[in-house]
């Protein structure tokens, strides 16, 4: 327990002891008065063998004085005999009156030490109960009557993290600046989530931290509150340069973290800024020259400034935060991170926050966490890897009916807030154009959009009460989009961890609720095994196929006649096949098992378009998968209908097409 917490406890105990002394004096006066006027004659004298007068006293003391001695406890308690017998000994005065004798000081001290030791030795489960006992032992040396309840005594820290049982933000009042607490209150937060309550105190003490928690568990506030407190305590000024760096994997997450930081800094005067790819570099340089105390950044742009902006002062850095560490490594920032860590001063506090712990994250922890780090894993003992308020399931759907199922589902839930995940940018682009064309308004976010467009769309969807957002995995990490009702995974994720991040966009916060739907082909059901191993429970959703909109013929006519949709559908189909071919779980998502004509139907094609894919054959030669040039199958002499070889020689290929 820290000194601050001990002082707090001592102060409480001293106040209570003062009150108890006054009460005990009154009790003694009352007992003296009642004992001097016994109801049943004189008080019996002490026996020659040193016998005590307790029994006689018990008969002679009136009811009022008995209640007084019991500390004002209800009559039921007295009748049931639950009041502890006082350890005070009675002696007979010369005039025959009995008076209580207080126990010697040494005995009281022994009891205090003994009970304190018992409280300190207690495990995390029993510590709160033991603490109350120890507090009562300190507070009531003269009157050992048992209390029914004691809510004033603060509970001691639990576990390794030093976090109080009290999870309200108000409990941080002695550790966190009042301006920060005021901002938290204005944001509407009353209680800390588990990751916050386990992380904030050790981070305020300056510990290095490696934290793992489910998506939507409140990791952002868990690191922002301590870093703001660090800057405030050090009285950082713009001329001191940058004191805190917060790294985010995507621009959207960086913007969101910056937004939360902006709200927390409402009542502070320190400078803060956002640095990310896609924004005006010269404006960022000017801000850095003026001095930014807290920077939220994406790794690529940050490294660029560290290497090429001479006036960027980062040598005074006190703290480095890496948010969504596993995602930063996944999207190819490993080298940039290593270079950034080398350039930063070695004496600093480091925090790594992540939703999943991978080997790469452990490697990053080894090179970035200098001091003995504290590991906080709030979900390690949980049976389920996803949040409790999430109802999740899957639907088995053949390839040719995938779009019909999606269209029916979105049409039915158009008044709700829905996110649909695709495997490629081109697939998002095509479905965005198609659905809007057929009067089902949707939004889209993908990596090939310009940053301004991505930002506008992101905030538009965040602020909307209902709507449909089509996206790639760029939106699956860390983004806190409020009140998402459904997560639909139209294309299956690359692995179970990616599934967890995708569904983490819904059912966020303490009492969040949401639904998740995974669409699988019959050949892909083996993926459920991997999800089960990753503690993801899925039930099969019932779907009435008779209610599915049969718009296949209209879709095919539309794609055939509309040139722009036709080109977009071709690119989407090709990117879907290529993404499928690059899947990490090839034993389940095997591109050779795809029925291309059926897959093509879901994109509105009667005949599959040609796709240039290099896949290894049994004889070691390179082969090509896909449909024919333009609309038909491309046929060569040594190929089955479902496969197309890659052209190795420069001989002219057979370009015949099926009529349609």
Curated annotation (Swiss-Prot):
Gene3D superfamilies: P-loop containing nucleotide triphosphate hydrolases (3.40.50.300). Residues 134-143 have a biased composition (Acidic residues). Its EC number is 3.6.4.13. Residues 25-40 have a biased composition (Polar residues). A motif (Q motif) lies at residues 169-197. Belongs to the DEAD box helicase family. DDX18/HAS1 subfamily. ATP-dependent RNA helicase that plays a role in the regulation of R-loop homeostasis in both endogenous R-loop-prone regions and at sites of DNA damage. At endogenous loci such as actively transcribed genes, may act as a helicase to resolve the formation of R-loop during transcription and prevent the interference of R-loop with DNA-replication machinery. Also participates in the removal of DNA-lesion-associated R-loop. Plays an essential role for establishing pluripotency during embryogenesis and for pluripotency maintenance in embryonic stem cells. This is ATP-dependent RNA helicase DDX18. It comes from Mus musculus (Mouse). The lineage of its organism: Eukaryota, Metazoa, Chordata, Craniata, Vertebrata.
